């Protein structure tokens, strides 16, 4: 893995999460939509680290694949909807991180900005030896953490931030994500921003509200959400 440990340039941002299904894809789409709206003279790369089962890559292709000066890439795909090392084992395949690394390098060389969606949580296995946190740290990817607005979210977030610090992930901030209409009215109860900032010493960059399916596929609506984030705290915007 030593060949992968060079510094990655700061135009690349990794979107990680506290768990599977917490809103990483919606958050990534909203950030990408903001770039689409505000960076007309720039080129963009959107990458899913790897995919198991169906889902994110197809949505990204639908939303962004047709845009000029955009590339949407998922370098490794497995049909089995399990953690990547287990999916690869079941399919008789191996996980070649060299392919993922080279894809990232190519995206960085060809685009002004690169946005990468992780899988699962920071503790999720990517190979039999490495987790998402290990990859983020090894590749020096500046990272934001998506926190679900639900009971137990603060404990999840604090534990994930502790893991990030242990593995030396360059964590830049938190994004709160509402997966249900009820969650929007429970932010202060379930994922109190002031308490999260106090315990993690990281800024809460913004809140992704509950979105209907049609809203999740509307670039203008997605861009509106991200425009309210504290993106001045990130170097990419």
UniProtKB/Swiss-Prot annotation:
The active site is at 48. The keyword Signal does not apply. ATP binds at residues 21-26, 56, 117-120, 177-178, 209-211. GO terms for biological process: biotin biosynthetic process. Pathway: Cofactor biosynthesis; biotin biosynthesis; biotin from 7,8-diaminononanoate: step 1/2. Pfam families: AAA_26. It comes from the Bacteria. Its cofactor is Mg(2+). Its EC number is 6.3.3.3. GO terms for molecular function: ATP binding; dethiobiotin synthase activity; magnesium ion binding. It is an enzyme of class 6 (ligase). Keywords: ATP-binding, Biotin biosynthesis, Cytoplasm, Ligase, Magnesium, Metal-binding, Nucleotide-binding. Substrate binds at residue 52. HAMAP family: BioD (MF_00336). Belongs to the dethiobiotin synthetase family. NCBIfam families: bioD. Homodimer. This is ATP-dependent dethiobiotin synthetase BioD. The gene is bioD.
């Amino acid at each position: 893995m030593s060949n992968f440990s060079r510094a990655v340039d700061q135009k690349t941002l990794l979107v990680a999460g506290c768990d599977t299904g917490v809103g990483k894809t919606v958050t990534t789409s909203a950030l990408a939509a903001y770039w689409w709206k505000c960076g007309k003279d720039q080129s963009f790369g959107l990458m899913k680290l790897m995919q198991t089962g169906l889902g994110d890559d197809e949505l990204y292709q639908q939303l962004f694949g047709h845009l000029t000066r955009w590339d949407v890439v998922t370098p490794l795909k497995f049909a089995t909807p399990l953690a990547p090392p287990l999916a690869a084992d079941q399919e008789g395949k191996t996980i070649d991180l060299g392919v993922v690394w080279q894809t990232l390098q190519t995206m960085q060389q060809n685009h002004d900005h690169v946005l990468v969606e992780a899988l699962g949580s920071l503790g999720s296995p990517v190979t039999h030896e490495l987790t998402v946190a290990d990859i983020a740290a090894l590749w020096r990817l500046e990272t934001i953490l998506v926190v679900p607005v639900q009971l137990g979210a603060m404990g999840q977030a604090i534990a994930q931030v502790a893991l990030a610090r242990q593995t030396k992930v360059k964590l830049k901030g938190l994004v709160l994500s509402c997966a249900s209409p009820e969650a929007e009215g429970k932010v202060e109860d379930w994922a109190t921003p002031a308490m999260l900032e106090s315990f993690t010493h990281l800024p809460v960059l913004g809140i992704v509200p509950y979105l209907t399916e049609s809203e999740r596929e509307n670039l203008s609506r997605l861009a509106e959400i991200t425009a309210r984030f504290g993106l001045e705290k990130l170097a990419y915007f």
